[in-house]
Amino acid sequence: MKGRRALEALNFFVADVQAGIGPFLGVFLQARGWGADQIGTVMTIGGIAGMLATSPAGALVDATRHKRSLVVIAGLMTMLASGLLWISHGYWMVAASQVATAITGAAIGPALAGMTLGMVRQHGFDRQFGRNQVANHGGNVVAAALSGWLGWRYGFGAVFVLSALFGLLSIVAVSSIPADAIDHDVARGADAKATAGEPAAAGAPASGLRVLLQSRPLLLLAAALGLFHLGNAAMLPLYGLAIVAAHQGEPSAFTAQTIVIAQLVMVAAAMLATRLIRWRGYWWVILLTFLALPVRGLIAASVIHAWGVWPVQALDGIGAGLQSVAVPALVVRLLEGSGRVNVGQGVVMTVQAAGAALSPALGGILAHRFGYPAAFIALGAVSTGSLVLWLSFGATLRHACAADGGAARNAVEAASPAS
């Protein structure tokens, strides 16, 4: 029980570590004379670096028995990268900071998922990961609210200090998790039938990486999420830039407001996600997230005003909150028994990161040339590709996403060649 509470505390504090000053980066650079296109491209550079690092990071999490140390190193590197950003505002120094933040952040997601699976096993993963995400979104709310107030009261420097403080607290939290609380074979999904009282077979062999390519539902999930994030990732920073450019809000305070609203909704969505999955299954829950984004784009284009942040970010919170629980849990179920669960998490995150990396450049260029409303409409239109894909392969995906997971697991096992 102590280990689980420490795990939830880690998820709370690591929320601000994963992205560094991420959401505040746009207004921070805008205040120093950067244009929307420059901001978009430098964020894309970081996104591409994170995309390239995510799959290797997942493989590393599967292979290592030092997952706690991996989180500590990632936290330290993120703090150093944020310090570099504060010291220098030159294009390539900022780009280097974003690359470092993205690479280290890429390791944290699979590491947290693997640690959770290793501690509570398959039968307890959905519930515990839901609790983790509630803590994570709660951490984002607190960090954003404090960052907004500190930035307004003391300037952007205080935002960097707060990020470093959260980094130190995340190190304390991960150090509080007992080393023997994590079964590293179970953590990579090597024991499909593990229960709370049955240890995994030591050194259980992992099936080949081809299982990832031969799991059609996994590839469809990744492709749909890639299209979703191509439209989604740029909306928050662009909406903040649009409001600030229209002189509708103070940069730090408004950026914090956008984050707090979304994260509060994410807390509620994450709390409901496990119940919705049990009631309707993964397919319907993920479909709901895809439906929310085009509507969000239309509202963002129509209401560039301070009060518009409420519907725009509430819809973001619904989509992100449900996905934060449903997607990792579905990947665990699809690859149960393969021994490559965290590689699978990394593959899905890589495709998501590809869409997210291209989104700021696409949105920034469109906003620079055609204005913010056109950019929001275009991003919302792009995201409908995820909806089309999810519906077109509905029969296959509904079968694989069934809440009992049996069909999906059998499909993966049938596709798994001997290593």
Language-model features: where?
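Helix-to-loop junctions at the C-terminal end of transmembrane segments
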Residues: 53-66, 151, 269-281
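Cytoplasmic helix-loop-helix junction between adjacent transmembrane helices
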Residues: 99-136
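Juxtamembrane intracellular "pre-TM" segments in multi-pass secondary transporters
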Residues: 1, 180-221, 411-415
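Symmetry-related core transmembrane helices of the 12-TM Major Facilitator Superfamily/SLC fold
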Residues: 158-175, 376-392
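A late C-terminal transmembrane helix in Major Facilitator Superfamily
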Residues: 340-368
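Structural signature of the two symmetry-related core transmembrane helices
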Residues: 69-83, 164, 284-298
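Loop-to-transmembrane helix entry
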Residues: 35-45, 247-264, 343-346
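Helix-loop boundary and gating motifs at the non-cytosolic
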Residues: 1-47, 219-220, 224, 229-244, ...
